[in-house]
Regions:
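Active-site-proximal cofactor/substrate-binding loop regions of enzyme domains
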Residues: 36
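Alpha-helical transmembrane segments
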Residues: 40-54
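Non-transmembrane, membrane-proximal soluble domains of secreted or membrane proteins
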Residues: 2-31, 51-188
């Protein structure tokens, strides 16, 4: 689809997902967002309550309580349980991102200074470079800073393994396709 994976003006959310993995990442993000929002509101309300109830005006004689075992166990176990509930789907997604058991094709992406080199090792070792177009080279409607002279073409509905590396004499590069839920750094 033309324009798939492009951000829109004033966009505050994720790009449209183009893979099942990205759909799961968006769902996980939504769940964690609401959990964190609820926790933040709870902590804020608890803090406001404690500040009000135990202020110097309301509490002329301060409490001499040194500890409360039940409360201490609760404020240790509840956060641990919340983290476990968040960690389980997170680990499942991390595993899915690195599951290479059913691969249809392999692509090798090599980061160079200001461009990427691509290889199709499974298909006659086809290689090419994708160099970003200058403003003068852009055609009408091509996105600035995203258009290259050669595009990486991938088949639809296939599991593709991308081997990401960097020129040994180069710098760290970031290979990313947000609509597929992929971002990987290439370190020399």
């Amino acid at each position: 689809a033309d324009g798939l994976g492009l951000a829109k003006d004033w966009q505050l959310s994720f790009q449209e997902p183009a893979s099942p993995l990205m759909e799961e990442l968006i769902n996980f993000h939504s769940i964690v967002f609401w959990v964190i929002t609820a926790l933040t509101i709870f902590v804020f309300l608890l803090l406001a309550y404690v500040c009000y109830k135990f202020s110097a005006k309301k509490n002329k004689v301060p409490s001499k309580t040194t500890h409360n075992s039940v409360l201490e166990v609760a404020w240790t176990l509840i956060p641990v349980l919340i983290l476990v509930v968040i960690a389980i789907p997170s680990f499942r997604l991390l595993y899915k991102q690195n599951d290479f058991s059913n691969i249809d094709m392999t692509i090798k992406a090599t980061g160079y200074t200001w461009y990427w080199g691509y290889e199709y090792p499974d298909h006659d070792d086809i290689t090419f470079d994708a160099i970003m177009l200058t403003d003068e080279e852009l055609a009408e409607g091509q996105p600035r800073m995203l258009s290259t002279d050669n595009m990486l073409v991938l088949p639809v509905k296939k599991n593709i393994k991308v081997l990401i590396t960097s020129d040994p004499a180069g710098v760290i590069h970031s290979w990313s396709v947000p609509s597929l839920g992929v971002k990987m750094d290439a370190v020399p």
